[in-house]
Amino acid sequence: MASSLMSNAITAVVGASGAQANMVAPFNGLKSIASFPVTRKSNDITSIASNGGRVQCMQVWPPVGKKKFETLSYLPPLSDAQLLAQVQYLLNNGWIPCIEFELEHPFVYRENHRSPGYQDGRYWTMWKLPMYGCTDPAQVLNEVEEAKKAYPSAFIRIIGFDNKRQVQCVSFIAFKPPGY
């Protein structure tokens, strides 16, 4: 393509009159790279990213003795005030709070298949019905307290369900039994 364009340009220059031939400069090829100043950059990425001189390495989650559950599972257990704030957040988003509990297998496991995916084998039992029409986060925490009294050795979680999109939007552990 480029060679055909160049040959057309040369034909046009050769066939043109003398006044027009002087207007188009001939193609001399690419300029030598030696004429351009070149700065060599190292491949060291530590010079690019900086945290202000404070070098600290973050620990990874210990794989023994501490299991991961849902959203916020890396944090210490939430206080009542923090739980109220989380429930208020899901109410502000228009999600329906729902309380679920699990007695035997709160951790991720696969009983019937080994493929990874959203369905990881954890089916929790719903505590009562979803709290449609709930506007007060204290109502949700009262239900969590009732579930704790009924099943003191159960894991209890709060989920936020979006009934318009028919999806679970948030899920977090509200109570872990002693020893976890």
UniProtKB/Swiss-Prot annotation:
It is found in: Plastid, Chloroplast. Residues 1-56 form a transit peptide. GO terms for biological process: photorespiration; reductive pentose-phosphate cycle. SUPFAM superfamilies: RuBisCO, small subunit. CDD domains: RuBisCO_small (cd03527). Belongs to the RuBisCO small chain family. This is Ribulose bisphosphate carboxylase small subunit, chloroplastic 3. It comes from Amaranthus hypochondriacus (Prince-of-Wales feather).
